[in-house]
Regions:
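A detector for small-residue-rich transmembrane helices and their helix-helix packing motifs
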Residues: 1-214
Length: 214
C-alpha cells in the first residue's frame, strides 16, 4: 500500500471510524424508508448542490452520501444498498477502519470539490463505483451471482463499470469531465501507485523477453 498512507495511519490511525459501512447503509435505508412512506422530497433536503451550499446549508457535504443511488426502480435501489454493504464490509476487513475511512472520505471530498468547482449537482454514483472498483482490484477472482443465477467474477463487474464510467466521462461537458475526475479522487489516490508499479513491472518483463529472444 502507499507509503503516504502508512505514515498517515501511524500518526492518525486511532481516528478511523469503526463500522462505517453499517452507518452508511443504515442511513441509506432510513432515507429510502422516509422517501417511500413519509416525505418524497427528503432527497432534496439532503442532496449536494453548490448554490445551496453557498447559502449556508453545509450539512449537505455529508448528508448526500445517505441518498441511495437509484437505477430507476425500488429493486435497483435495494440491490444497490445491499451491494454497498457487501463490498464495503469486505473492504473494511481488508484495510481496517482507518484506511477504509480515508478511502471513503477522500471520495466524499472529491465529490464535494467537483460540485463546488463545476456547479454540477452531485450524486453517490462515483462513490458507489469507487467501492466496486476497489473490491474488484483487491478480489478479482471472487465470484458473484448475476441475477442470483449466473456466476461471474468480480473483475468483470469492475471492467464493465469502468467502461460505463469512461463513456459517461467522454460524453460529459468540460465541467462534467472535471467533476467525474474529482469524484474518483479516492481511486486515484489509492490505486494509481499500484497501477504505476504494475505497468513498470510489465514493461520490464517485455524488455527482458525481447532481450532474451536475440
Amino acid at each position: 500500500m502507499n507509503n503516504w498512507l502508512n505514515r498517515l495511519e501511524r500518526k492518525y490511525g486511532r481516528y478511523g471510524i469503526p463500522n462505517l459501512t453499517n452507518i452508511l447503509v443504515a442511513g441509506q435505508i432510513l432515507v429510502l424508508a422516509i422517501e417511500l412512506f413519509v416525505d418524497r422530497t427528503i432527497s432534496f433536503w439532503l442532496g449536494l448542490s453548490r448554490s445551496l451550499l453557498l447559502q449556508g446549508q453545509v450539512w449537505r457535504v455529508i448528508s448526500f452520501i445517505f441518498i441511495p443511488f437509484s437505477g430507476g426502480s425500488i429493486l435497483s435501489v435495494v440491490l444497490g444498498i445491499y451491494f454497498t454493504w457487501f463490498v464495503g464490509t469486505a473492504l473494511e476487513r481488508e484495510w481496517g477502519d482507518f484506511r477504509y475511512t480515508v478511502y471513503l472520505l477522500s471520495g466524499v471530498l472529491g465529490t464535494v470539490l467537483g460540485c463546488l468547482l463545476t456547479g454540477v449537482t452531485a450524486s453517490t454514483y462515483c462513490l458507489s463505483l469507487s467501492l466496486l472498483l476497489a473490491f474488484a482490484m483487491l478480489y478479482p477472482e471472487v465470484q458473484l451471482l448475476l441475477f442470483f443465477v449466473i456466476p461471474i467474477r468480480v473483475k468483470y463487474f469492475g471492467v464493465f463499470a469502468a467502461v460505463l464510467w469512461v463513456f459517461s466521462f467522454l460524453g460529459a461537458s468540460l465541467p462534467g469531465k472535471l467533476d467525474y475526475l474529482l469524484s474518483m479522487l479516492n481511486v486515484w489516490l489509492f490505486f494509481t501507485p499500484m497501477a504505476y508499479r504494475s505497468l513498470r513491472a510489465w514493461v520490464r518483463r517485455e524488455q527482458w523477453k525481447r532481450k532474451n529472444r536475440r
